Amino acid sequence: MKQAVIVDCIRTPMGRSKAGVFRNVRAETLSAELMKGLLLRNPQLDPNLIEDVIWGCVQQTLEQGFNIARNASLLAGIPKTAGAVTVNRLCGSSMDAIHQAARAIMTGMGDTFIIGGVEHMGHVPMSHGVDFHPGLANKVAKASGMMGLTAEMLGKLHGITREQQDAFAVRSHQRAYAATVEGRFAKEIYGIEGHDANGALIKVLQDEVIRPETTMESLAALRPVFDPVNGTVTAGTSSALSDGASAMLIMEESKARALGLPIRARIRSMAVAGCDAAIMGYGPVPATQKALARAGITVADLDVIELNEAFAAQSLPCVKDLGLADVVDDKINLNGGAIALGHPLGCSGARISTTLINLMEDKDATLGLATMCIGLGQGIATVFERV
């Protein structure tokens, strides 16, 4: 079977969704700039070789509608002979884009793909136009479409305390801030033009969402936001609202080598899995178990792990049931996660994979896992191997 490899991976800085640096920048522009960036960074690649552009996006309406993958690829100047498709697996959309490209390569249906994802949550809110079928309440718990309440449920089932959630959130901000100050995000962030607080045009080079001042005391002062009476999940222990995009150049290994392109990682295995929609945040557990089995490895073989931090109350049960509680500080989200950086829905799968690959390089690691939960009860996971 042919091998799918990551040649390059980049992301935008994460902009705050409310009056942030990308308030005047459209989702198509964020996407197109990354597509152009991949080509500029890899001049050996003839753009005419691109088979398809596969782009994740959840709210496919307004500026993100009418196949944003094609709109962005045309804006980027990618040859019109390349295809383009927008995919939606909710939070796992751009990781699904990775999987779609990998499967195509493995089965001989192309050897060069640009993949990624975007979500401008400031321009297109998560709930915009959503209208659940009334009959869905006969199949799943009524609150299954309310992500915060599913996190509350999962946290309660696993005995996750408010203090544990707050500590996990503080860790996320501290690590993301340290990664910024120490330049550990520099290789993955591709600068994008935006606007400062005064409206001046600037080149944005750092994430805007991180709050280094976050402490246990400041989080303790926040009130539960989803279940005000009995809940423990606050805005501070939930993924931040942010705007951003991520992108990868994925190729068939021998083709990349023939062109003299770098091989940053190989896709070792992939998996998706379902779980009860009422505890959708548990999805990484069965998805990871599948991916590890397909790779022929165990969780102990993993050197670095990126687990998307939708909520602290969701992440901690996954850490526990995957047998990772004792290695959190050694292996998991070493540069912080979505609580600090935000979770632009369609962007996050390729974003955490990009962060993972850079961490693997920094630590000279061999095996890494990127995994995330998905609304309405799914999980998705990818095992990467440096070669």
Swiss-Prot record:
One of its GO terms (biological process) is phenylacetate catabolic process. Pathway: Lipid metabolism; fatty acid beta-oxidation. One of its GO terms (cellular component) is cytoplasm. It is found in: Cytoplasm. Coiled coil: none annotated. It catalyses: an acyl-CoA + acetyl-CoA = a 3-oxoacyl-CoA + CoA. Disulfide bonds: none annotated. The active site is at C91 (acyl-thioester intermediate), H343 (proton acceptor), C373 (proton acceptor). Keywords: Acyltransferase, Cytoplasm, Fatty acid metabolism, Lipid degradation, Lipid metabolism, Transferase. It is an enzyme of class 2 (transferase). One of its GO terms (molecular function) is acetyl-CoA C-acyltransferase activity. HAMAP family: FadA (MF_01620). Belongs to the thiolase-like superfamily. Thiolase family. NCBIfam families: AcCoA-C-Actrans, fadA, PRK08947.1. Catalyzes the final step of fatty acid oxidation in which acetyl-CoA is released and the CoA ester of a fatty acid two carbons shorter is formed. Heterotetramer of two alpha chains (FadB) and two beta chains (FadA). This is 3-ketoacyl-CoA thiolase. It comes from Shewanella baltica (strain OS155 / ATCC BAA-1091). The lineage of its organism: Bacteria, Pseudomonadati, Pseudomonadota, Gammaproteobacteria, Alteromonadales.
